[in-house]
Amino acid sequence: MIRPSAARSHADTLAEYLKERLPHHRRDTLRRVAEVLFGILQAESTLHRKIALHIEREATPASITRMVARTFHETNLTPQDVCDVLLPLLPPGRLTFVMDRTNWKLGQHDLNLLVLGVALGGVVLPLNWKVLPHGGSSEMRARMFLVAQLLERLPASRWAVLIADREFVGEEWFSFLRGQGIKRCIRIRENTQLDALPAHDAFQNLKPGEVRAVFEDVMVYGSLMQVVATLSPQGERVLVASDLSVWDTLTTYRLRWNIECTFSAMKTRGLNLEQTHMHRPDRLSRLFGLLSLALAWMVRVGEWRAEQQPVPKKKHGRPAWSRASYGRELLCAALRWGRTTFYTHFELLKSPFSAPGRKKSQPVRY
């Protein structure tokens, strides 16, 4: 159990920082946000009653549960607010951005989130998102809207590249990104036309692990781009169109996996986003914003902890824990037992991640 004085101190500390970053919000509102954020971290749940169990207040459990509900129902916490809180975590220089979508069902409701974020610490930190009103693919206008909004806070000079999967294609979309000065690294479908030739005809008889590229840029959805292909160990042909060099295209595209790690840490393997009973777009968006703050903090603490004490490895050589789990363990111990180490972890929320290293690779053409 958290000592009441420690709980109040920790919530007040975070609320004061949030007030610095978000001066247009009321201090008491931000304190509730801080309390709910701490509750989510400790409960690993998005159910109101489970979050309420970890909030120390002189009130009945039912009253605290209603307070948690009001935080999601009434607090006008926008994606832009979350982005403003997370900006100090971004290292200087050019950054790699990833766009993807995650969806699930709640009864008869399709819950569908389009997410744009930055690749750091082995995950993608969400900086902007939109709750889609259906269960299918994203519309081009929604993608363009997210990018345009984020460009207001992070100009194109900070964007090294935007990575996306096969869903995120189209002539207008490719033209928009080029017009904004954003380099693209986007997987394309096998039936995509490269000049006048279907992509699958241009890359026949690929062997697993083999990499091939066109000898010169070709027209892809109205844009001249490099196209690189490989065959996965499972036998799936992977074709990527990009504005990067041949030998950097696939290396960069592999970073798209980071957003799968994000969704995993937010959903069943982490904070359990899918447990929520909320389906209204505004409330779901606020919940996702709080989970984004929690994830960023967990990963930042996990990165710091790994520098002090590397993550143990299992027999197959993979890490025993993700950076998010590694950081959450320390955060929860500090919150639960009122430890002063909380303030060390709190300072990490205000300090940038290490600049992502870029592995060099040798150019190979086929």
What role is predicted for each listed range?
Residues 1-46, 53, 57, 75, ...:
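Single, function-defining residue in the core of a domain
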Residues 90:
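Acidic-basic catalytic patches of nuclease active cores, encompassing PD-(D/E)XK
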Residues 100-113:
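An active-site-proximal beta-strand-loop segment
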Residues 61-74:
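Major-groove recognition helix of helix-turn-helix-like DNA-binding domains
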